[in-house]
């Protein structure tokens, strides 16, 4: 199929708290779209307030996909996401609608848009062994080990990113080859749609930091800590030996809330830690996004007109058609 005949889709990317959800809803209403979440926290049931999951009104107004796929004690891989997202996109296109990929999880975007190398499957025993070692020497110590066996991967993975450290060491231990070897292999099947990549990011870092702080305060006012208490109280979560090793609990904000509810520090200290962790996440997201050379960057507040022109230029101006048809 020629490239210009492929179905269209848009990818709304950006750091946390940059306005992706609002733009996705606007685009879905204007261009008759459905939203495919590209967020590793939103796949977990029970993670609502702290994950900024679309509420019932949003989901009633616009169909959303890939939310609430797993319980918080379960694991969901990038490969599983890519398969589920590909299926959702095919169904959206079959309905004659626009797929809108919205989120900030770079690994998910990479898996879907570029394909994943043929990495070895997850190994529970290896993961458990690595988690036990982390209890003894810490993730920084394991990052040092990774630097010895796979310096290429260690240079890409931050010492405070336990999930990726664990996966890189797991791959090395079960296959005998570093994860960077597997990632350098030709990727799998690419997504058969033509995608416009849009990055939303305030030009001034202070603006993003302010949005992060205000959003956390709003989450606390909405009952974020009570939500985490509910997740902690689930029998399946109470049965987990080291819940802080679960991907759902490692989500930014949830980890800091979990530690606070375990008695680590005051409420003010929890707030400061959560804000700092979210800023660090945003920094990592921006670093990854700068590698997306075919993406177009817009300030969500200052570049509204340029952003609209870019979307209309790619998708066409369907607003008049939709208004006339009553859709």
From Swiss-Prot:
EC supergroup of this enzyme: transferase
Top-rank taxon: Bacteria
Keywords: ATP-binding, Magnesium, Nucleotide-binding, Transferase, tRNA processing
Any one Gene Ontology BP term: tRNA modification
Binding residues for ATP: 14-21
Site (Interaction with substrate tRNA): 105, 127
Binding site for substrate: 16-21
UniProt keyword annotation of Ubl conjugation present: no
Catalytic reaction equation(s): adenosine(37) in tRNA + dimethylallyl diphosphate = N(6)-dimethylallyladenosine(37) in tRNA + diphosphate
Molecular-function GO term, any one: ATP binding
UniProt cross-references to Gene3D superfamilies, sorted A to Z: 1.10.20.140, P-loop containing nucleotide triphosphate hydrolases
EC annotation from Swiss-Prot or TrEMBL: 2.5.1.75
Region (Interaction with substrate tRNA): 39-42, 163-167
Record Pfam families: IPPT
Coiled-coil features, chain-numbered ranges: none
Cofactor(s) recorded in Swiss-Prot or TrEMBL: Mg(2+)
InterPro entries associated with the record: Dimethylallyltransferase, IPT, P-loop_NTPase
Similarity remark: Belongs to the IPP transferase family.
Quaternary state and interactors: Monomer.
Its job: Catalyzes the transfer of a dimethylallyl group onto the adenine at position 37 in tRNAs that read codons beginning with uridine, leading to the formation of N6-(dimethylallyl)adenosine (i(6)A).
Name this protein carries in UniProt: tRNA dimethylallyltransferase
